[in-house]
UniProtKB/Swiss-Prot annotation:
Membrane topology: Multi-pass membrane protein
Cell compartments where the protein resides: Cellular thylakoid membrane
InterPro entries: NADH4_N, NADH_Q_OxRdtase_chain4, NADH_Q_OxRdtase_chainM/4, NADH_UbQ_OxRdtase, ND/Mrp_TM
The protein's name: NAD(P)H-quinone oxidoreductase chain 4
Function per UniProt: NDH-1 shuttles electrons from NAD(P)H, via FMN and iron-sulfur (Fe-S) centers, to quinones in the respiratory chain. The immediate electron acceptor for the enzyme in this species is believed to be plastoquinone. Couples the redox reaction to proton translocation (for every two electrons transferred, four hydrogen ions are translocated across the cytoplasmic membrane), and thus conserves the redox energy in a proton gradient.
The UniProt record lists the keyword DNA-binding: no
Pfam families (UniProt xref): Oxidored_q5_N, Proton_antipo_M
Biological-process GO terms, alphabetical: ATP synthesis coupled electron transport; electron transport coupled proton transport
Catalyses which reaction(s): a plastoquinone + NADH + (n+1) H(+)(in) = a plastoquinol + NAD(+) + n H(+)(out); a plastoquinone + NADPH + (n+1) H(+)(in) = a plastoquinol + NADP(+) + n H(+)(out)
Keyword Transmembrane: yes
Length: 534
């Protein structure tokens, strides 16, 4: 078969899903689930290797449009088709999905309860998350977006902590109800005009009136604000993280939150640019609220998982600011922040899980003095925390700096608007090391809990755990030292996207129109002569 016509994306989506069929038939003579774990890990790695191969052989960095495109009629009477493709916006997140999921499978080695069902859900979620980033049909996007909720709900409700049913129910209520807004907006856009279609490129080409755009934008924003999440629609996340296991933490922080940021750019910005110009100042304000409020709330948390969860909410505020900056640098920083936080968030939550497995507590006051028992975990926790507080030389620093500079240099907003926003966001950056460093002090060098530190099970990191963190730190440091590793994947796309949406900004459009008019006046004035060059 010609490699140019091979259905790469469909293969990457359906391979892990189809592989789940074999899970009930894998023999497990010892009843510990070891063969099942190895099978799931092999399937995850095979899919990731195929993804890397497809990326290096099929993806063109200089191309801003869709690549590896596939179109198959599904319900032609309704204008629905299985249409997938990857561009600079989706490809980094597809790569992130393969990387994080493979490591999450390795991180799930201690899971012994119902391993067949557990890995069935993980592999099904793997394919579904790639589909969310690849599908180019709005109705199919809604379907895979909804189907993603089922594995997460079951992973929370079956393998979660003491309040797992409450956390899982809250998650499904928030996300399922908000997702109805996607369906309503999708149907409205599909039926608008003479042609019934759910194809994203066809929808982007339609000429919607501004009021219609604003209504659809609001519907999409509500749904994606829950998943991102945006304050005040964030309260499901601390509860979900508070009850999840380590591998589910990694999937939530590493991939699930990025679905909200990706969808906000793909649907709100690309399909509804005029409405985005009106909503952009509000998005920036919401981003600042996310940064400040979540940072202050994280500082007050005494539960380790909830503290890191609020830290995630704070960092996602930079994504909102970058998306609304109307600059190449700001938009690029938003995409980089999603990738960076996916890596950093996954590493921190994995270490939280490793610490809990040893201490059996998440309350900071009940920890203390464990650095002497767990020096390797302390070193890894400290390094990942430095990445989270945007230490120079790590990916978080580059992403946040790009967002800051992108907004500060944006000509879409007045100086009176930009300066307070940059100052307030900067305060949020200052708060981050305060709560993260105090967290490290309380866990590892706080008042020693003799009963805890003398326990024989309080052992240091094992090779598997060191390997997982090492795999996450390599791209975190690599991107921090040489950001082009990742930015070259999406630079062409973000540049094209910003050029597409900038004319929708009234202030920019007025200036450009005035410039064009002045040039036209000069050209039309027959008496005008260029000054002679002496």
């Amino acid at each position: 078969m010609n490699p140019d016509t091979f259905p790469w994306l469909s293969t990457l989506i359906f391979f892990p899903i189809m592989a789940t069929v074999a899970l009930p038939f894998i023999p497990d003579p010892k009843g510990k689930g070891d063969p099942i774990r190895w099978y799931a890990l092999v399937i995850g790695l095979i899919d990731f290797v195929l993804l890397i191969y497809a990326f290096y052989t099929q993806y063109d960095f200089a191309e801003s449009g869709l690549q590896m495109v596939e179109h198959y009629d599904w319900l032609p009477q309704l204008g629905v088709q299985w249409s997938v493709g990857a561009d600079g916006l989706s490809m980094p997140l597809i790569l992130l999905t393969g990387f994080i999921t493979s490591l999450a499978i390795l991180a799930s080695w201690p899971v012994t309860y119902k391993p067949r069902l557990f890995y069935f859900l993980i592999l099904a979620m793997y394919g579904g998350q790639i589909a969310v980033f690849a599908v180019q049909d709005l109705l199919v996007f809604f379907l895979v977006w909804e189907l993603e909720l089922v594995p997460v709900y079951l992973l929370l409700s079956i393998w979660g902590g003491y309040k797992r049913l409450y956390a899982a129910t809250k998650f499904i209520l928030y996300t399922a109800i908000s997702s109805l807004f996607i369906l309503v907006a999708a149907l409205a856009m599909a039926f608008f005009g003479p042609d019934l279609t759910f194809d994203l490129q066809s929808l982007a080409a339609k000429d919607y009136p501004l009021t219609f755009q604003l209504l659809c934008y609001t519907g999409f924003l509500v749904a994606f604000a829950v998943k991102l999440p945006i304050v005040p629609l964030h309260t499901w996340l601390p509860d979900a993280h508070g009850e999840a296991t380590a591998p589910v933490h990694m999937l939530l922080a590493g991939i699930l939150l990025k679905m909200g940021g990706y969808a906000l750019i793909r649907m709100n910005v690309e399909l509804l640019p005029d409405a985005h110009a009106y909503f952009a100042p509000a998005l920036i304000i919401l981003g600042v609220v996310n940064i400040i409020y979540a940072a202050l709330t994280s500082f007050a948390q005494r539960n380790l998982k909830r503290k890191i969860a609020y830290s995630s909410i704070s960092h996602m505020g930079f994504v909102l600011i970058g998306i609304a900056s109307f600059t190449d640098l700001g938009m690029s920083g938003a995409v980089l922040q999603m990738v960076s936080h996916g890596l950093i968030g996954a590493s921190l939550f994995f270490l939280v899980g490793a610490t809990y497995d040893r201490t059996h507590t998440l309350i900071l006051e009940e920890m203390g003095g464990v650095a002497q028992n767990m020096p390797k975990i302390f070193a890894m926790f400290t390094t990942c925390s430095m990445a989270s507080l945007a230490l120079p030389g790590m990916s978080g620093f580059v992403a946040e700096l790009m967002v800051f500079v992108g907004l500060a240099t944006s000509d879409a907003y007045s100086l009176a608007f930009r300066v307070p926003v940059v100052i307030l966001a900067g305060i949020g950056v200052i708060l981050t090391p305060i709560y993260l460093l105090s967290m490290l002090r309380e866990i590892f060098y706080g008042p020693e809990n003799k009963e805890l530190t003398s326990h024989e099970k309080l052992v240091d990191a094992e090779p598997r755990e060191i390997f997982v963190i090492a795999c996450l730190l390599v791209p975190i440091i690599g991107i921090g030292l040489y950001p082009k590793i990742i930015t070259q994947i999406y630079d062409a796309k973000t540049t094209q996207l910003v050029a597409y949406i900038r004319p929708s900004v009234p202030s920019i459009a007025m200036r450009e129109a005035a410039t064009v008019a002045s040039v036209s006046d000069i050209e039309m004035d027959s008496s005008y002569q260029a000054p002679a060059i002496k």
